[in-house]
UniProtKB/Swiss-Prot annotation:
This is Short-chain dehydrogenase chry4. The lineage of its organism: Eukaryota, Fungi, Dikarya, Ascomycota, Pezizomycotina. Its EC number is 1.1.1.-. Keywords: NADP, Oxidoreductase. InterPro entries: NAD(P)-bd_dom_sf (IPR036291), SDR_fam (IPR002347).
Length: 259
């Protein structure tokens, strides 16, 4: 039995992965952004070990989530599933657009503060291949609301996440750090017209959570078919990897250990 935490697990991929992992007798901790959502998911998944509550658009709440997770103990697997794509423009407490914060900054903070688990899984996307790879204005602070475009921002954040996965993999020597593209499937994030099959992505989540792969692998990218895939070539650039780490450190004041 593995101890597993899945962020953003009140619906979509996170919920379904949690449901299946609970059925497989794992100790699964859920995450909800508020008490109402927590109460709803506890009713739907009564076999969950617990529900942690945090709004991942703020530093303080993300830090609280890490503290509460650490108090439970070291996890076998953590899936950083929470994400945003479309929706009205709003800012995090640091002035960063909420989707950039949830997709990139909050996972960085959480990973930096968490007791390293055996397996740490970040949600990437095949859309990272469409990103602006220049690393200019990573957090959209210069462009702001007037120039905001949610789809390009999402693509960029996922490119930065794959860079971050590589950087963290060099630091967490005893952790298998993985990026995964879950697939373009009907979820709240992707919309109900998405053509893919959720079952494929869920199977990959379950495989990674259970460690049913070569766990000596780290800093690698999986597709929804449980296979390793080739990320954008520039995600192997060490300077770009460290530039994303430095940007996140300077923004948040929270540091990763040195590689």
């Amino acid at each position: 039995m593995a101890r597993i935490l899945i962020t953003g697990s009140t619906d979509g991929f996170g919920f379904e992965a949690a449901r299946q992992l609970i059925e497989r007798k794992h100790q699964v901790y859920l995450h909800a952004r508020n008490q109402e959502r927590a109460d709803e998911v506890k009713t739907k998944l009564p076999g969950a070990a617990g529900v942690l509550i945090a709004d991942l658009t703020t530093v303080a709440e993300t830090r609280k989530l890490a503290d509460e997770a650490n108090a439970i103990g070291t996890f076998d697997a953590v899936i950083l599933n929470a994400g945003l794509l479309y929706g009205p423009f709003r800012k995090s407490d640091l002035g960063v657009p909420a989707s950039v914060f949830v997709n990139l900054v909050s996972p960085y903070i959480f990973a930096a503060l968490l007791n390293p688990p055996k397996r740490l899984i970040f949600i990437a996307s095949v859309l990272h291949h469409e990103a602006d790879t220049s690393l200019k204005d990573i957090f959209w602070l210069e462009r702001g609301e007037k120039e905001w475009k949610d789809f390009p921002a999402y693509c960029d954040a996922k490119f930065h996440v794959v860079l971050l996965v590589n950087a963290i993999a060099r630091r967490f020597k005893d952790t298998s750090v993985i990026a995964v593209h879950p697939g373009y499937v009907p979820t709240k994030l992707a919309g109900q017209d998405a053509p893919g099959k959720m079952e494929d992505g869920i199977e990959t989540y379950v495989m990674l959570a259970e460690g049913d792969y070569d766990t000596s692998l780290t800093g690698v990218y999986f597709d929804p078919k449980k296979e390793r895939a080739q990320p954008h070539a520039l995600t192997a650039d060490l300077d770009k990897q460290e530039a994303v780490v430095k940007a996140c450190e300077e923004l948040t004041g929270i540091k990763l250990p040195s590689p």
